[in-house]
Amino acid sequence: MQVTPDAASFHGGIVTALDVSPAGVLLNTTVSASPVLEFRDFSLRCDKSDPEAAFDNAWNWKLPPGKRIAVITTNSFLRYQLIVGLAGLVPPVSGEFVGEGVIGWPVGGEGGLDSKLRVSHALDFLSAVYGDCLEHSCVSLDEILKLLLEANIHPDLIIKGLSKSQKDFFFLSLSTLFAFDLYLIPKTKYLMSRAAKPLKSLLLKQIEGRGLIATSTNSRFLREFCTDGLVLGRAGEILFSGEISESMQWASANLESFEVSDSEQDQFEGQLNFSNSESSNDVDDF
């Protein structure tokens, strides 16, 4: 277990300090592999009622390949900001993040597709855009097509005309098809449902050895999908890091009003302004 100071780097599954910790211990390590993601003086909005409120201490840390991180915080607005920020939907307040490889759109999201497209056209479009990710995928297009047909989602159907459950299945199947270098998982209600079980097993296979950042508080999801946890304060400060079970236990003992359950957590409020300025448009779709 380790309580961390401001500047940190993921190494061996633990956020390790690059500077003297509050306890006066110098923990200076290096990351051997090229990071899949690096934060440089990175800061986001962290209070939906105050557009000027950002991280108390900017992030400077690296995420190496293969680390699957659960970001644990009681600040639901910060969880949302982190996902849409990494997805490129809102800019940071300061700094930047850079990475080696492809960051996928939030898992289960619409991937920027026009709802008037047919299922087949959507698959063709994304396969063309993410051709390299499809080439390196351990899930075949035929596997996905078979599952879609079993869910009565036929290639000639228009996305807009699908039922809600069909849309959930379709969009999760798209996220499962491609081998991204970094996956973003904000919500897990459908992913952890019985209806999504065949896709869940494929996604678990797909993310093996790849990076993941998740903001769900579903305990079953965290234990199945994440290797490590990063506990944040309400202003984005890194409070603790470690193996996922340790991180969950630490958060339960030290974060006021924190709890995890087997049910879905936040339902993001689409009518709120989740951008980094008062004048920006609302972002409510992935």
Protein language model features and the residues they cover:
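Conserved H-loop
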Residues: 217-225
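A short, flexible loop at the N-terminus of ABC-type nucleotide-binding domains that lies
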Residues: 5-62, 66, 70
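ABC ATPase nucleotide-binding domain signature region
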Residues: 62-130
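Conserved catalytic loops of ABC-family nucleotide-binding domains
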Residues: 202-218
